[in-house]
């Protein structure tokens, strides 16, 4: 099963279609990518095909279950903890002890897997680098495959390079590098450039499978003293403990297939859906031999609330997104429950993102933003988190100082059980308690950020600087879903008295595109994908039926 894609737009690997069903037929339909043959080896492709054959039916069942669960929430208008798993929540159990490389996670940096980011993230001084194939990556075939090549090159010490402008990028000594934790795509996304038996593989199977196949043994051979001494993962968009169970079974299968000791893999689950927030114990329990912790998201969590309660009435209408902070009562309840759950079970609790991009041109903006970042990280450290995320290397020392002040020489604060007061379902769902208002300014910001992000995503960029913030797909999701929610609930905007309507959104969108055309100039504007982005933005914001993920209708536009 050779994988040189340069000879044909579609290569068939493996057995002919008439062969035994025991032999998978694999088709690589992606465009040529330099050095793809180093990643898409016959053995690696067969490994991914094995994951597909073993687990694709269950993935599809779980995706169907998401729709059933959403219908149940719509009918009930609420959520609660699962009665059938009360014994797990009440039980006395812990997850496996974290390996040495994951004991101290006080600062984690996130970003895509392009060559420049690989070097900068590993050198950043952060303890962990979340190498992102998910929300910070636009999943072009080039990005997906080159990202895998770049990670292998980093481990092999051949990632150094010099730009055309003469700037050199080189890794520090291995002991000074961040530990890599890879985030594959969520269960819902297909990879249309690799088919098994005529069916696209899950992006999750491809991202996880290629990385694990090529690097698991390599990392273990480096020894426990090395920061990169094991295969570690972040699991996104998990909606239930059954989805965590599937990941655990994938891990068990993968380790057995490659002769890697059981329990070598460690995974941190992002609690970025409202349904997962009600199943934190259960999620850790399903992954207990492979679990490393839980992470508290923000934009995707709010997006999930809108998605699930979009027709549940005024109580669930989110105000301007920038007014909803992690200190809002319902968000504070969610983070409190996450810290309590993690520390009770011996897992790390990792805080949210500081997305600010420092500017050398505007010291006043920098000073105000860095003060806000410091306050956020001080709060997280004081609330019991064991670490937190940043999006830019310049924020690493800011976050580290906040956690150093609380942790000192301790690697974490898992021995702190957190507040003893239980968190209730009512507290998690008290959206109205956030206060705030819905405004035209907030609506305009949602349009501005949404259209800018989608256009960049269509050009292959997944992490995009917008208004001094590093944004990824989660920001676009909350932006477009809030627009949908406000329109369908007849929200009246507090600052102007206008009603949120599709017509108003189209007016704001047209004005924004005109401003962008004037700002960029005709040539640069014409070279972009603004018209396609505008059509897609209208589709996912204004359609009668709510689109589960904007990336689903966007994916075919990537080519």
Q: Residue locations for each model-derived region?
A:
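Expand to "…catalyze enediolate/carbanion chemistry for C-C bond making/breaking, isomerization
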Residues: 2-559
């Amino acid at each position: 099963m050779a994988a040189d894609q340069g000879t044909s737009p579609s290569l068939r690997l493996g057995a002919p279609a008439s062969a035994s069903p025991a032999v998978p037929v694999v088709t690589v339909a992606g465009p040529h990518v330099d050095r793809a043959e180093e990643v898409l080896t016959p053995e690696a492709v067969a490994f991914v095909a094995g994951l597909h054959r073993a687990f694709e039916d269950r993935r599809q069942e779980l995706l169907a279950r998401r729709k059933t669960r959403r219908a149940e929430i719509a009918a009930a208008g609420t959520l609660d903890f699962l009665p059938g798993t009360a014994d797990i929540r009440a039980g006395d159990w812990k997850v496996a002890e974290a390996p040495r490389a994951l004991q101290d996670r006080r600062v984690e940096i996130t970003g895509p897997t392009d060559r420049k980011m690989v070097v900068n993230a590993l050198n950043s001084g952060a303890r962990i680098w979340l190498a992102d194939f998910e929300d910070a990556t636009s999943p072009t075939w080039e990005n997906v495959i080159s990202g895998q090549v770049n990670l292998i090159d980093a481990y092999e010490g051949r990632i150094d390079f010099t730009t055309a402008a003469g700037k050199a990028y080189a890794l520090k000594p291995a002991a000074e590098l961040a530990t890599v934790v890879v985030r594959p795509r969520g269960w819902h996304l297909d990879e249309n450039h690799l088919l098994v038996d005529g069916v696209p593989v899950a992006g999750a199977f491809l991202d996880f499978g290629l990385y694990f196949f090529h690097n698991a043994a390599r990392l273990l051979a480096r020894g426990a003293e090395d920061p990169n001494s094991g295969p570690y993962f972040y699991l996104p968009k998990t909606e239930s403990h059954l989805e965590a169970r599937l990941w655990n079974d994938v891990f068990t299968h993968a380790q057995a297939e490659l002769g890697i000791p059981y329990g070598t893999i460690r995974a941190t689950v992002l609690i970025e859906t409202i349904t997962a927030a009600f199943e934190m114990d259960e999620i850790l329990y399903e992954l207990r031999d492979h679990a490393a912790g839980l992470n508290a998201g923000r934009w995707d969590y709010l997006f999930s609330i809108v998605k699930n309660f979009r027709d549940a009435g005024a109580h669930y209408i989110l105000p301007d997104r920038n007014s909803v902070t992690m200190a809002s009562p319902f968000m504070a309840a969610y983070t409190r429950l996450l810290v309590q759950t993690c520390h009770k079970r011996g897992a790390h609790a990792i805080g949210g993102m500081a997305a600010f991009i420092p500017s050398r041109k505007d010291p006043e903006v920098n000073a105000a933003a860095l003060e806000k970042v410091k306050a956020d990280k001080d709060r997280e450290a004081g609330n019991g988190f064991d670490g937190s995320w940043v999006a830019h290397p310049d924020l690493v020392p800011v976050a580290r100082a906040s956690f150093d002040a609380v942790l000192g020489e301790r690697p974490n604060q898992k021995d702190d059980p957190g507040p003893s007061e239980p968190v209730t379902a009512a507290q998690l769902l008290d959206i109205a308690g956030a206060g705030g208002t819905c405004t035209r300014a907030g609506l305009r910001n949602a349009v501005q950020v949404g259209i800018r992000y989608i256009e960049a995503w269509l050009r292959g960029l997944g992490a995009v600087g917008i208004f001094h913030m590093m944004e990824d797909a989660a920001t676009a999701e909350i932006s477009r879903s809030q627009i949908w929610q406000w329109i369908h609930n007849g929200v009246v905007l507090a600052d102007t008295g206008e009603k949120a309507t599709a017509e108003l959104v189209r007016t704001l969108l047209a004005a924004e595109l005109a401003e962008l055309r004037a700002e960029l100039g005709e040539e640069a504007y014409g070279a972009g994908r603004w018209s396609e982005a505008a059509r897609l933005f209208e589709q996912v914001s204004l359609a009668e039926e709510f689109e589960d993920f904007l990336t689903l209708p966007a994916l075919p536009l990537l080519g």
